[in-house]
Amino acid sequence: MAGTDREKALDAALAQIERQFGKGAVMRLGERPNEPIEVIPTGSTALDVALGVGGLPRGRVVEVYGPESSGKTTLTLHAVANAQKAGGQVAFVDAEHALDPEYAKKLGVDIDNLILSQPDNGEQALEIVDMLVRSGALDLIVIDSVAALVPRAEIEGEMGDSHVGLQARLMSQALRKITSALNQSKTTAIFINQLREKIGVMFGSPETTTGGRALKFYASVRLDIRRIETLKDGTDAVGNRTRVKVVKNKVAPPFKQAEFDILYGQGISREGGLIDMGVENGFVRKAGAWYTYEGDQLGQGKENARNFLKDNPDLANEIEKKIKEKLGVGVRPEEPTAEPGADAAVTSAAAATDDTAKTVSAPAAKTTKSKAAAAKS
């Protein structure tokens, strides 16, 4: 009898909450629709796989941090380009006042439709972010960078004044306000951050990020990006080998790593990453300096194989699909008119896999191979 009374009381409370706050304000977890995680591809197949869901999750906070010139902005601009190619609206809050539109254009960003803000101080920047997110019209918003979100009091004060904790409090308040709106509008917020060193640390890493601890807690994904090697063509440096570690991930298992090439003036080499992952997963065969795919030679040396895939985007897409299907992450939907190196639309991992099964047929694969052979000859 007591149990029945408790159930009636709970049902009455739930009904009252729904009347007061609206339908869906409270529900049993099993009644909530289990929607697949929608993502924005990063431009690197290896990183999409390391993230576990095929890209950066929609409606979440993402932090990208690392040393100077490690590729933070480049990685973010690739995500911007991919969101735009899917028909999404993107805003870029350039607090550093350092965005190069020509470089962004080379990476595939539609600069004519990119919403840009270059705020005067941190409060103004985060107020703009809050208003844009609450509009519900954005798919992605980028803040570059957290370190440049200088509080108004610091800008208006004297050079030697101490402003302890101002930026941390500002970030904490802003994240409290925008996190819920991000989830409701399915907008991804990417915060680019810089590294600092703690003084007097004897054990462990002295490195830390700016802006206090709030961003570490609110971020669903945190990416640590580092330059590990300089790529050279003879004696000339042509790019960097980059490693990204997923140090926090709320949507898949964390602590996975991805490596890819960033070429100067071109950005992330998608084709180079496909060759590396193709060899690793057995789809591309390497014999000496030659790379082959299903009996067809891609080229002698990685650079020639990379150029061949760039000239044959259908073949590159086919290799990418096979890699992602094998590893069980989101697959790029087929785009017949896609340009070389063009990246995927924003898709969910599960839906994309189903779409691929429907769109890829044996005749299409044969046509691709015949094109590859013709291009070789």
UniProtKB/Swiss-Prot annotation:
Taxon lineage: Bacteria, Bacillati, Actinomycetota, Actinomycetes, Kitasatosporales
Major place of residence: cytoplasm
UniProt xrefs under NCBIfam families: tigrfam_recA
Record's subcellular location: Cytoplasm
Organism in which the protein naturally occurs: Streptomyces avermitilis (strain ATCC 31267 / DSM 46492 / JCM 5070 / NBRC 14893 / NCIMB 12804 / NRRL 8165 / MA-4680)
Compositionally skewed regions (Low complexity) per UniProt: 342-377
Keywords recorded for this protein, A-Z: ATP-binding, Cytoplasm, DNA damage, DNA recombination, DNA repair, DNA-binding, Nucleotide-binding, SOS response
Name of the protein described by the UniProt record: Protein RecA
Residues forming coiled coils: none
PROSITE patterns: RECA_1, RECA_2, RECA_3
Keyword DNA damage attributed: yes
Gene Ontology MF term list: ATP binding; ATP hydrolysis activity; ATP-dependent DNA damage sensor activity; damaged DNA binding; single-stranded DNA binding
